[in-house]
Amino acid sequence: MNSFALLLVCIQACLVQSVFSQCTSRAAVAADRGIIGGYGLGAPCSLGYGLEAPYGWAGYADFGYPAGAYGIDAYGGIGEGNVAVAGELPVAGTTAVAGQVPIMGAVKFGGDVCAAGSVSIAGKCACGCGEYGYGLGAPYLY
């Protein structure tokens, strides 16, 4: 019974800590002498090359080099990726392509490829492009 009571006290302490931590904001962390502020990890004199500093983990954002532009983002940061499919793929349907399809790169088929039929893709893109190129359903911006 004592171990069960101790477990309940520990769970209640975690819940109380979680509830009261929601009342404070991140202002204490980003205060003048906090973790990121004037004398903290991103300070210009003490740890100027820390987490938030211009040369720190955040990258070269102040100099116009976004973090995802040079290979930090998925697929090399510039939309490159490889897809390998092996096996028999029985696909039936109709294909209709209308409009502009900007594809740069090469397509290589190896082995016997028997293709007959057509494919039709209609609707919105599902790749995360939206208004201004972000979000679901908006056209690509090039």
From Swiss-Prot:
This protein's UniProt keywords: Repeat, Signal
Signal peptide range in chain numbering: 1-18
A single MF term (Gene Ontology): structural constituent of egg chorion
Domain of life assignment: Eukaryota
GO cellular component entries: egg chorion
GO biological processes: chorion-containing eggshell formation
Annotated function: This protein is one of many from the eggshell of the gypsy moth.
Homology family: Belongs to the chorion protein family.
Protein's name according to its UniProt entry: Chorion class A protein Ld19
Organism from which the protein derives: Lymantria dispar (Gypsy moth)
